[in-house]
Amino acid sequence: MRLKHLALGLAVATALPVAAVTAYAEEGIYIPLFTYRTGPFAGSGIPIANGMADYLNMLNERDGGIGGVKLIVEECETGYDTKKGVECYDAVKGKNPAVVNPYSTGITLQLIPKAAVDKIPILSMAYGLSASADGNLFPWIFNPPATYWDGASAFIRHVADVEGGFDKIKGKKIGLVHLDAPYGKEPIPLLQALAQDYGFELKLYPVPAPQMQNQSSLWLDIRRDKPDWIYLQGWGAMNPTAVKEAAKIGFPMSRMVGVWWSGNDDDARPAGPEAKGYSSLDLNAVGTDFPVIQDILKYVVDKGKSQITSKDKVGENFYNRAIWNSVLIAEAIRNAQKITGKKVVSGDDVRRGFEALDITPARMKELGMEGFAAPVKLSCADHNGHGGISLVEWDGTKWNTKVPSIQPIKDKVLPLINSTAEEYVKANTGWPKRTEPCDKSS
């Protein structure tokens, strides 16, 4: 994989010999990846960056790209900084990107108003603004396969299952330990609504970014408050610190559950045996026992075309999550080619491809991913799918599936998505009404 630095000082990884910017559209399908291999969030960012790039580059090496067209894969380092993320967007938007992956809720929020103007679809896979799942109001934003509100509701359903029913969680105290940033705050409205509906007490424990690795006082507050359950909405260095601090105060790990971004192997591993029993919501399988991952090893990793530093990292949770992210991109591009009859597709075409996305179990098997993730079906109205979420548990060395599928509480989530989406549009004067065409699922 060749590396180059752009004028902004951004690291670039291309799957083709480096071409002039003006020739990108003619030579291939351009896919920029916003990544963060540096800074306090790098522990989460590195495996994601590797997995996304490795799958796309595997398609180039094995298949010659998609539909006979090579993919031009380019990384832009954001450091998980919103300002840098917007700079990355400004740097790539003139290169006819098929899609933009912000990999940050803060960056996503800044790009949402720009997407329709620039005709660039935004894929915020299971992150970003939950309300953007409403495709009628956000035709350029996609956040499959589940929103943060789906995740928070799945957590509450799990709590109810363990406690013996929704009626049994009345009077319980549930704490949300969250990064004090847009990402961390995203589940709060849904949890507040569920607290009112089911009668539990919600306690909020925000963690400012500068204190991510110094949470001792917060966990002393938790020891004092004695919540019955903890939901962790952390990221980067915050996650392993939280797991270690929970163990330190003796909080029962079986009652601490992380969102799917708090389930990296390196989130639990540093706490050693004391992390045993910690659980995380999940969206994908772990391990390398899938033909697709064997192909990534064969065509990319074993040939030295990956930035991964250790082969053992292949198959870990976030690496596999990123593969799933890139599969969604690739399938949307295939759909776009099928719908339009074009080989080199634009962002406008790929938006249509996302809306026609229907990844069935049969298609997962064709992709070499049988059992890797739940099926995903999007539509013009539903840009998420709100699919089943699994729960994995750390056994001291690795993740194991504890609950294969937990359905979101859709009768609570969907009305909130619709009402919040409408509020967003009303608050943003001049928000364009949808005029984009709608295609059948493919």
Predicted feature residues:
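Gram-negative bacterial Sec-dependent N-terminal signal peptides
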Residues: 1-23
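Venus flytrap/periplasmic-binding-protein-like
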Residues: 78, 122-124, 129-133, 210, ...
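Periplasmic-binding protein-like
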Residues: 92-105, 123-125, 173-178, 226-236, ...
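Extracellular/periplasmic Venus flytrap/periplasmic-binding protein
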Residues: 130-131, 139-249, 287-294
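Extracellular/periplasmic periplasmic-binding protein-like sensory domains
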Residues: 246-325, 405, 420
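Segments of small-molecule ligand-sensing domains
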Residues: 305-319, 330-404, 408
